[in-house]
């Protein structure tokens, strides 16, 4: 499947930074390939507007957000307050449409893997039911190891096709802090999921070159299929 879901351990884990870095990387190195960026569902103002500004005027990048609520809280609560349904079929149709029209699609989830999408479903449920290849963003901080272990367990329970873990730094860190708080070998050993690298702290997420450079240090091979890599390189 020519798509990748970027989810995290929690709200503020670094999903938007990682999605932006991956999008900037593909836009820079594969400019002839069409890239789709979709925020599956948004409450309040934020990520969708960021991606629109980031790729304004770029015909090779399509940015969509099929379902939005004004209230910046969990979707089932926002929908209830606004007296609106949560028609996930609209989200699914938008995703499928992007998959058909683009060479690769980056889909950013909402909140964390366990965050509610409806009163019955979480992000993990959608990722599993929709069979989306998924990467888990784990913020580098005290408690990162436990968060990674718990979220990988949830991913397995809901049959998420988890391709790897990406660590994200929300503030400047020393090598010692990175090693102490999010040791890659230990996280891999406990979860059985490869840690694909670290996105360092970035002062801005509007610099496409800086974003692409940060993604270039990741092990990107597990995140796209052989067909997509052949297409990109062809």
UniProtKB/Swiss-Prot annotation:
Stretch forming the signal peptide: none
Cofactor(s) needed for function: Mg(2+)
Associated pathway: Cofactor biosynthesis; biotin biosynthesis; biotin from 7,8-diaminononanoate: step 1/2
Enzyme class: ligase
Residues binding ATP: 12-17, 47, 108-111, 168-169, 200-202
Cellular compartments annotated: Cytoplasm
Keyword Magnesium in annotation: yes
Keywords noted in UniProt: ATP-binding, Biotin biosynthesis, Cytoplasm, Ligase, Magnesium, Metal-binding, Nucleotide-binding
Reactions accelerated catalytically: (7R,8S)-7,8-diammoniononanoate + CO2 + ATP = (4R,5S)-dethiobiotin + ADP + phosphate + 3 H(+); (7R,8S)-8-amino-7-(carboxyamino)nonanoate + ATP = (4R,5S)-dethiobiotin + ADP + phosphate + H(+)
GO cellular component: cytosol
Binding site for substrate: 43
Database matches in InterPro entries: DTB_synth_BioD, P-loop_NTPase
EC code(s) of this entry: 6.3.3.3
Family according to the record: Belongs to the dethiobiotin synthetase family.
Self-association and partners: Homodimer.
Function: Catalyzes a mechanistically unusual reaction, the ATP-dependent insertion of CO2 between the N7 and N8 nitrogen atoms of 7,8-diaminopelargonic acid (DAPA, also called 7,8-diammoniononanoate) to form a ureido ring. This cyanobacterium does not encode bioA (which catalyzes the formation of the precursor for this reaction in the cannonical pathway), instead it encodes bioU, which replaces bioA and also performs the first half of the cannonical BioD reaction. Thus in this organism BioD has a different substrate.
Name of the molecule in the record: ATP-dependent dethiobiotin synthetase BioD
Source species: Rippkaea orientalis (strain PCC 8801 / RF-1)
Lineage of the organism: Bacteria, Bacillati, Cyanobacteriota, Cyanophyceae, Oscillatoriophycideae
């Amino acid at each position: 499947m020519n798509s990748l879901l970027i989810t995290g351990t929690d709200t503020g884990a670094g999903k938007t930074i990682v999605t932006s870095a991956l999008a900037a990387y593909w836009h820079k190195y594969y400019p002839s390939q069409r890239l789709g960026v979709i925020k599956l569902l948004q409450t309040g103002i934020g990520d969708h507007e960021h991606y629109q500004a980031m790729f304004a005027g770029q015909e090779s990048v399509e940015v969509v957000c099929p379902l939005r609520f004004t209230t910046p809280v969990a979707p089932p609560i926002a929908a209830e307050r606004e007296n609106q349904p949560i028609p996930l079929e609209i989200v699914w149709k938008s995703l499928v449409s992007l998959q058909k029209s683009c060479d690769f699609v980056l889909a950013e989830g909402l909140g964390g893997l366990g965050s509610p999408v409806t009163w019955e479903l979480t992000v993990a449920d959608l990722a599993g039911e929709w069979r989306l290849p998924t990467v888990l963003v784990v913020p580098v901080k005290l408690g990162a190891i436990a968060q990674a272990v718990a979220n990988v367990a949830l991913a397995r329970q809901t049959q998420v096709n988890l391709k790897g873990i990406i660590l994200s730094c929300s503030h400047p860190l020393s090598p010692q802090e990175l090693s102490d708080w999010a040791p890659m070998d230990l996280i891999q050993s406990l979860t059985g999921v490869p840690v694909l690298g670290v996105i360092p702290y970035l002062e801005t997420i509007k610099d496409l070159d800086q974003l692409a450079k940060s993604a270039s240090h990741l092990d990107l091979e597990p995140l796209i299929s052989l067909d997509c890599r052949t297409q990109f390189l062809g």
